[in-house]
C-alpha cells in the first residue's frame, strides 16, 4: 500500500498540527553552544519550512491557541499584578515601562526608517524582545484594524516573518548581554548581592538546600538546669540561642505543651523541634548522654504546607514581622509569581505570595489562618470558573470605542488578558474559587502557544524566501538594536535615576524582558539568588505591558 504523506497531511488538519508540534519540539531541544533553541522557535521553524511546501491549517486552531495562551498569562500575573501596581513596586513598574516603552519607540522608528509595513515592524519588535505576548497582541489587533483580504494576509505573513527572523538574535544577544554587560559597566554583581544580603540578613546561596525539621527528645540534667538559671522559656529564648524550640515537656509522667512561663526542672523530658544542623549545634548540656526515645513524647506530625498570603492585616507587612518561629513554625521557601525568592525578613508581603512552612500540623494551621489560607493540594481544575472568565474576556474584547471617524476595539488579546488577571487575583483572595493546578496552567499555556506558533508559521511559510531576501539584513540589524538598546537605557535609568542596587537592577531588567535563561546567567554571575527579588518585581507587570505594546504599535502605526 502506497501512502502519499503530503496528501495525508493536507487532508487532515489535526494530524498536520501534531506532526508540526512533535517535530518542532524535537528541534527545540537542540543547543547552539550553551543556548537551547526552545520550543517556540523549534515549532516556528518547522512550521515555516512546511508552510513553504504549501501546507496550511485551519485558522480557528490558531485563534484558539493564542486565546488560551494569553488568558493563562493573565491568570499567572493576577495574584501579584495589583500589588506591584499600587504598592512599593513603583521602581519595578517604572523599569518595566522604560524597557517596553523604549523598545516600542525604537521599533517604530526603525520600521519607518526602513520603509517596512506594520506587520514586519510588529514582528521585529516581538522577536527582538523574545516576547510571544507582543506577537499575540499585534496579530489580534491587526485582525480587528479594518484590513481585509490580501492586505490583512500580507500583514499577518510579515508579522510571522519578522518574528521568525529576529527571535533567535533577540534571545542570543540578550544572553550575551546578561553575561558581559555587568563586566562592561565594571559592576561586581557578587559584591552587590552580598551588600543586600548583609543589609537584610539574607542567605545568598542560589542553591540553598531545604531540610524538613526533625524532633528529638532530651532529659533535663543538672547542667541544663544550671544553664537555664531559673529563667522561664520566654526569657531564655531557646530558639534564638539554639535554632530549636521546645514543643512538649513530660514532667512527672504528664505530657504537656509548654507556654513561655514554663521553667525547666530536673528530670523533665523535653521534645525539641529544629533543622538537623540546629540539633547538631546544641550545647552539650542538652545532648551528652541525655537523649531519650519516648514514642508519646516524639509523636508529633510535622507537615509542610504552602500558605497563600491573603489577609489584609498581613499584606504590606514585612516577612520578619510574622515571627513564624515564635509560633513553632519554620519557613522553607518564599514564592512570588512562580519564582523562588531569597528568604528576606525585609520582603514586603504581597497578596498571592506563597510561603512554604513546616511544623506541627496544628501550629501550621493556626499560622495559616492568620496569614491567609493553605493552598489546595488538588489536581482538579475549576473548569467552570475557567470557562466563565474566558467568556467574559471574549465579551470584553468585543467592546469598541468610537471617536468621530476613528474607532478602537479592545480586542480579544486585551480582553482575555484582563479576564485572566481578574481570575488569578480572585483565586489569590478566595481559596476555594477558580483553582487551577500550576501544572495544568502551564500545560494549557504552553499548548496554546505551540498551536499559535504552528499556525503562524504555516500561514507565513510560503513567503519567507522572498521576505528573507528583501529585508533579511535590515531585520537582523534592527533586531539587534531593539534587543540591546532598551536594556542599556533601562540600566542607565535604574542605576542613575532610581539608584538601585546593581544585583536587584540586573534581575529586574531580565524580568522586564521576561527572559528566564538570561536571569539564570545573572544569578550565576552574582553567585546568589538575590537578583530573583528584582526579576519577580518586574516579571508579572512586563507580561501585561508587552501584550499591550503589541496592540499599541498597530494602533499608532500610520494607516492602520
UniProtKB/Swiss-Prot annotation:
Topology term for the membrane: Multi-pass membrane protein
RCK C-terminal domain location: 200-288, 292-373
GO biological process, one term: potassium ion transport
Keyword Transport: yes
Transmembrane feature ranges: 8-28, 32-52, 66-86, 91-111, 158-178, 383-403, 406-426, 447-467, 475-495, 539-559
Gene Ontology molecular functions: monoatomic cation transmembrane transporter activity
InterPro entries to which the protein is assigned, alphabetical: AAE_transporter, RCK_C, RCK_C_sf, Transp_YbjL_put, YidE_YbjL
A GO CC term assigned to this protein in UniProt: plasma membrane
Major site of localization recorded for this protein: membrane
Localization annotation: Cell membrane
Taxonomic superkingdom: Bacteria
Keyword Membrane: yes
Cystine pairings recorded for this chain: none
Keyword terms: Cell membrane, Membrane, Repeat, Transmembrane, Transmembrane helix, Transport
Family: Belongs to the AAE transporter (TC 2.A.81) family. YbjL subfamily.
Protein name: Putative transport protein ESA_02488
Organism: Cronobacter sakazakii (strain ATCC BAA-894)
